[in-house]
Amino acid sequence: MKNLSSRRYTLKGTLALAATLIAGPCLAAAHAADYHLLNVSYDPTRELYSDINQAFPAFWSKTNSGDSVVVTSSHGGSGAQARSVLEGAPADVVTLGLAYDIDILAQNGLLATDWQKRLPHNSTPYTSTIVFLVRKGNPKNIHDWPDLIRDGIQVVTPNPKTSGGARWNYLAAWGWALHQPGGTEQSATTYLKALFAHVPVLDTGARGATNSFVQRGLGDVLIAWEDEALLASRDLGPDKFDIVVPPLTILAEPPVATVDRNVQEHGTEAVSRAYLDFLFSPEGQRIGARHYFRPVDPAIQAETAAVFPHTTTFDVASLGGWTRLQKAHFSDGGVFDQIYSH
């Protein structure tokens, strides 16, 4: 149909064109597609991706009129979610808590090993950081990492073997200890051992840990994603909790990727890529900011600057990178297994 104006028509061609025009609406309907995408995500993104999933179909239809898109999301601890995809969960996209969990999928052939180069900011549409959520009025006077190991303080944090957020929490504490004057891996290990002696129970995911703290009343302080702490404070009332941003903490970078093997099987490559592109769009960035994820778009950062307090951060690369850290700390027999005796 695009090149009709350049053709010379015979009577036969004219009749064929007429038939095509009459059938046009039927052909257009036949070419419309129904897409069903599965986003396998980590624990504290339920509300974020509920809104993203509702907004994305309109974004897709701007250039794909007539298509229908339904996106569903699955949530849990990031490590456990990655394992579910390895075991056959039909994810079109993964939006996990840390790059290592997606690297595992790449190492097993589910997507390309250079997946982080496909999208801006190492395929990270939003960032966060690690903060402390405390009871209103901060009755235990918790302001910084050393306060967490004082006598009588109970700390709530999830299990770093199953939760991406827990690994960020752990590494925030580890990195803080390393950055202290004279800090060494030995002194950081000593601090982590003292910290986890104050943890009465390990939930499997960040949302479970939040529920233990805010609903069950367990503990004096929750180590949490900034977005999770802000969400809890907003939804349960600022009269119940305060947020403490430690002077030094970690830059948390939760990345996203298409699962190449699955989207090729499902025929959803283009729509899955567009879904991830939407996260970087101004609309997607604003949705992220509404759910307290720090945007990466400078314009949206400027719009939302008042929401996010300034803090000094270090990143995972400065600690040696995920591959080294995973092996040293979170593999069987690693530092975490050595220090956690419960």
Predicted regions and their residues:
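Periplasmic-binding protein-like
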Residues: 124-129, 191-196, 203-204, 236-269, ...
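Short helix-loop capping/hinge motifs at secondary-structure junctions, enriched
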Residues: 137-143, 162, 175-183, 262-270
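Ligand-binding pocket segment of bilobal, Venus flytrap-like solute-binding proteins
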Residues: 180-247
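N-terminal segment of the mature folded domain
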Residues: 32-162, 305, 340
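Extracellular/periplasmic juxtamembrane helices and adjacent flexible linkers that interface
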Residues: 263-342
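Short beta-strand->loop
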Residues: 40-42, 134-136, 154-181, 195-199, ...
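N-terminal export leaders
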Residues: 7-14
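C-terminal segment of classical bacterial N-terminal signal peptides
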Residues: 21-30
